Amino acid sequence: MLARSVGLAYAAANRRDFDSVLVGWDPGGQYHPSGDLLPPDLETVFYGHDGYLELWRYWLDAFADIRWDPEEILDFGDRLLVTTQQRGRGSGSGVAVSEPVFQLFTLRRGLVVRQEDFLDRSKALEAAALPTLSGPVSRGQVR
C-alpha cells in the first residue's frame, strides 16, 4: 500500500500534476533540497505549497524533462527514505543528468511536513536518525 502511494505521488510530480502532489503536503511543510543540486543564489529552504512550486519552477527552467524515479522505500514510521534516480537534460546545454537522490520525508497526520534531499545515502540514513528508532524497518520496492 505504501509503495503504491509513494509511486503515485512521484508519477503525479513527473507528469506535473502538482495539485495531486500537494494533497499529501502540509501547507506549512518545508522542502530542503540538496545544496549540491542548486545554484548558490537560490534559497536553501522552501516553505509551504508556494515554496514547493517555486522549487519545481526552478527545476523545470533548468531541465526540460526533469523527473525523479523512485526505486526503494525505507519506512521508519513517521519518516520515509525514498531512493530515487533523478534524470533530465539541461535546457540550455542538452547535457543528460542521471544520479541517485535520497529523499527523506517526515510525516505528521499523514502529510509531508518536511522533505530533505541528499546525494549521499549515508548522510540520508544519518538524518533519518536510525539509531533512535525502535521497531522494524519496512523495505519496499516501488512499482
Region spans (language model):
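A solvent-exposed, acidic/Ser-Thr-rich amphipathic alpha-helical stretch
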Residues: R4, F18-D78
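A beta-strand edge to alpha-helix "cap/lid" segment located at domain peripheries
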Residues: M1, W59-R143
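Hydrophobic pocket/interface hotspot
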Residues: A9, V21-L22, G29, G48, ...
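Extreme N-terminal tail/first-helix region
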Residues: M1-Y10
